[in-house]
Amino acid sequence: MLVVLLTAALLALSSAQGTDEEVNNAETSDVPADSEQQPVDSGSDPPSADADAENVQEGESAAPANEEPPATSGSEEEQQQQEPTQAENQEPPATSGSEEEQQQQEPTQAENQEPPATSGSEEEQQQQEPTQAEDQQPPATSGSEEEQQQQESTQAENQEPSDSAGEGQETQPEEGNVESPPSSPENSQEQPQQTNPEEKPPAPKTQEEPQHDSGRPKKPLLPFIANLIRERIRKLLARSPLGRRF
């Protein structure tokens, strides 16, 4: 922008100087013409008129010669100076800056693209493969085998007491189906005295069974206790002489 403004100012100055010189030359050319025409009008000799005409022609030829150089010299020299300066201002940045930046960017881009693709990805993959293998192998051997062993042991423990409990339950209903003989008032008085010490031991058995079968639902205790009491009463009646009478 500064270069363009300077060139415009110089052109304006040169045009102004050219117009001033043209005006001065025109004034100088008009003055001798008037001086030469005066003797012609006064009636001078023909040879003097011819000489005046030649002088006028020489003055006219000299005037354009004086007019041309400033117009050509100033503007042409300024234009010739401006052209190389403009070419210098325009060409170097286009060639030097862009080409150098492109040449610098190409190797930097190649360096940025190539190394991570070869070094980073391969090293990370190589590191991830052994770590994944280490993470996968130990739990398969340690955790699963230990859990299976624990489950098998717990299942075996849970099955054994259940079998024993099932056998006891199967035998109980068979005895409960036996009809009890009618009891007399004397037997009714003797029964609570004989059954009180024997009713206490079965209570802890019922409390211990749920401990073995913790995972299974608890069974009602009242019918189980009632069946035990009936069995004890029948056994006592069978042993006592009063029960044999009836």
From Swiss-Prot:
Question: Where, in residue numbers, are the sequence repeats?
Answer: 67-89, 90-112, 113-135, 136-158, 159-181
Alphabetically list the UniProt keywords.
Biomineralization, Repeat, Secreted, Signal
Q: Where is the composition biased (Basic and acidic residues)?
A: 197-216
Q: Where is this region: 5 X 23 AA tandem repeats?
A: 67-181
Task: Provide the residue span(s) of the region labelled Disordered.
Answer: 14-223
Predominant location: secreted
Tissue distribution is: Submandibular gland acinar cells.
* Any Pfam family: Pro-rich
Renumbered to this chain, the signal peptide range is 1-18
Which terms in the Gene Ontology molecular function aspect does this entry carry? hydroxyapatite binding
Q: Which GO terms describe its biological process?
A: biomineral tissue development
Compartments reported by the entry? Secreted
Positions with biased composition (Low complexity): 39-50, 58-71, 81-93, 104-116, 127-141, 150-159, 178-196
Q: Name one GO cellular component term.
A: extracellular region
Under the heading PANTHER family, the entry gives: BASIC SALIVARY PROLINE-RICH PROTEIN 1-RELATED (PTHR23203:SF20), PROLINE-RICH PROTEIN (PTHR23203)
Q: What does this protein do?
A: GRP proteins have a marked affinity for hydroxyapatite. They may play a role in the formation of the protective acquired pellicle at the saliva-tooth interface.
Protein name as it appears in the record:
Submandibular gland secretory Glx-rich protein CA
Which species is this record about? Rattus norvegicus (Rat)
